[in-house]
């Protein structure tokens, strides 16, 4: 059982996966967005190949906790993903996820060109790891 994490942007979707135990998140790939149908088809392929049972999608929020226009687009994407895949889809606060991913890549001395290629999947891993950590800290019945 794996959980998939997504960082949904206008041009790309960063994808991360949990390990089988649902303890750690690893960056998987960056999907270059072409059309909603192609995006959903690729996510279906990933779900089938890796045994994804749930998607966690980063929900953009302002620093004051409010939702902006990007959040509405993300909600619409989540609804389409849930309807298309038949899997549960949860929103998770993505505030500062890209900044955290950037910091990790800078500390690892990754070049600017390489950072640009991997930042979205790293942000997805940060989002998913936050979800997994919160899940581990709560009683199992709260995640039914």
Swiss-Prot record:
A GO biological process held by the record: rRNA 5'-end processing
Positions of transmembrane segments: none
The principal location of this protein is cytoplasm
Q: EC number(s) per UniProt?
A: 3.1.-.-
Q: Which CDD domains match?
A: YqgF
What GO annotations for molecular function exist for this entry?
Answer: nuclease activity
Per the record, the domain of life is Bacteria
Q: Which InterPro entries match?
A: RNaseH-like_sf, YqgF, YqgF/RNaseH-like_dom, YqgF/RNaseH-like_dom_sf
Family matches, as Pfam families: RuvX
Report keywords, A-Z: Cytoplasm, Hydrolase, Nuclease, Ribosome biogenesis
Q: Name one GO cellular component term.
A: cytosol
Subcellular location(s): the record lists: Cytoplasm
Gene3D superfamilies per UniProt: YqgF/RNase H-like domain
What is this protein's function per UniProt? Could be a nuclease involved in processing of the 5'-end of pre-16S rRNA.
Q: Which family does it belong to?
A: Belongs to the YqgF nuclease family.
Q: What is this protein called?
A: Putative pre-16S rRNA nuclease
């Amino acid at each position: 059982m794996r959980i998939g994490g997504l960082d949904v942007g206008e041009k790309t979707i960063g994808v991360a996966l949990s390990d089988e135990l649902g303890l750690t998140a690893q960056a998987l790939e960056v999907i270059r967005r072409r059309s909603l149908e192609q995006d959903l088809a690729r996510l279906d392929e990933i779900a089938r190949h890796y045994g994804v049972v749930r998607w966690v999608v980063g929900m953009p929020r302002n620093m004051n906790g409010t939702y902006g226009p990007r959040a509405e687009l993300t909600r619409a994407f989540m609804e389409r993903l849930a309807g298309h895949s038949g899997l549960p889809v949860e929103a998770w606060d993505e505030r500062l996820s890209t900044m955290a991913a950037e910091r990790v890549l800078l500390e690892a001395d990754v070049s600017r060109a390489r950072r640009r290629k991997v930042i979205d999947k790293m942000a997805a891993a940060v989002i998913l790891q936050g979800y997994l950590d919160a899940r581990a800290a709560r009683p199992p019945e709260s995640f039914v």
